[in-house]
Amino acid sequence: MEFKYLVFIVLCQYLDNTFFSETEAITTEQQSLSTLITPSLYVTTDSQNTAGNALSQTTRFKNISSGQQASPAQITPEQATPAVYVSSSPLTYNITRQAESAVNNSLPQTSPSGFTLTNQPSPSTYNSTGQPPKHLVYTSTQQPPSPAPTSSGKPEVESTHNQPTKSTPTIYLQRDTPPPPPPPLTSEPPSGKGTAHKNNHNAIAAILIGTIIISMLVAILMIILWKYLRKPVLNDQNWAGRSPFADGETPEMCMDNIRESEASTKRASVVSLMTWKPSKSTLLADDLEVKLFESSEHINDTSNLKTDNVEVQINGLSEDSADGSTVGTAVSSDDADLALPPPLLDLDENLPNKPTVTVVSPLPNDSINPQPSPDGLNQVCEEQHSKIQEPFPPPPDSFNVPLSAGDFINNQESAHEAQCQEFSTPDLHPDLTDSLPPPPTELL
């Protein structure tokens, strides 16, 4: 099937739609047919069903005078728009057999205007007459229909009714004036399973990374708080030890804190850092020296205690001699360098049996103090011996026999005296000087 028949069928369908319109629209459509038949046509088909869709698609052409523009036909956005281009240049065209079969199937259609295929005029051939096209029809998928002016000057609004499932071919007619710029097309992002899967994976990865970071921060905070609470801060005022200017002893709490701090710190000896280590012999020698030093200190302490006791005894004897209760022997200054007498024995055991004789070195103050007379000293000694040798009173014959008032008083007094003698401490200093010879007359 040739291309001219296809174009004729399209024009017939267009005329069918125009006959139902007003009379003014019919006159304008007839003029547009005369202008569209003169130039040569160039048709490009994108698929096998393009010709069939073109046969069933209704297209509205408008008669436009020279210098006027044609309004685009409205097409639904879901339909594909294969381009149909009309050129004035002589070109040779090859029609595929698929298009021919599609057109042959559409031949039984009849045109409502009464024209048949045999009545097609000859100017619709392949070769163009060389006349430049004067009009251009541009079909857009988004531009709304616009009113088309007629030769009488009255605009007419015409709309095309397209089938929602078929593609509409776009016909371009060249003209001298440049066409208006096409409107911007908004392309929707393709939505499919691939993009959905990618979005899901990205969201899952973001959630995992966020949970990991949050869990790490929480764990770090918990560790810091645990360490801070495990070691409470001690408000110790004596953290540096006992102050050298402090008066008195440190309290028990401070001492406990100091001991704990000392126990916690580990001290290393300097000997462990030395290359030379002391042997066992040197250690033993050091131990012996320490022991000898301690023993010498102990001996010195005991000797000092003995000398202190002797000095105390000498002072006591000098005081007693000043009171006239004791008799001391005067020793010349030549005998002052003699050794001290041996320590005194237990006086309690030897006192009643044998009086001890001691030689006491006189003090320098003793020579100044006057000595008591020997008669007075003898009387005092006799009184003390009589008191010590006095026997205890005999016990009563029987406790059942009642005693008289005088006997009872005497018994009480005797018991009281016995208890006093029993618990009283005897004066030892006079007993020590009982057997001493009288002092020389030079000192008197």
From Swiss-Prot:
Residues 24-203 are extracellular. This is Protein EVI2B. Coiled coil: none annotated. It is found in: Membrane. The modification Phosphoserine is found at residues 269, 272, 279, 295. The chain crosses the membrane at residues 204-224. Residues 1-23 form the signal peptide. Residues 104-197, 318-337, 361-444 are annotated as: Disordered. It is a single-pass type I membrane protein. It comes from the Eukaryota. GO terms for cellular component: membrane. It comes from Mus musculus (Mouse).
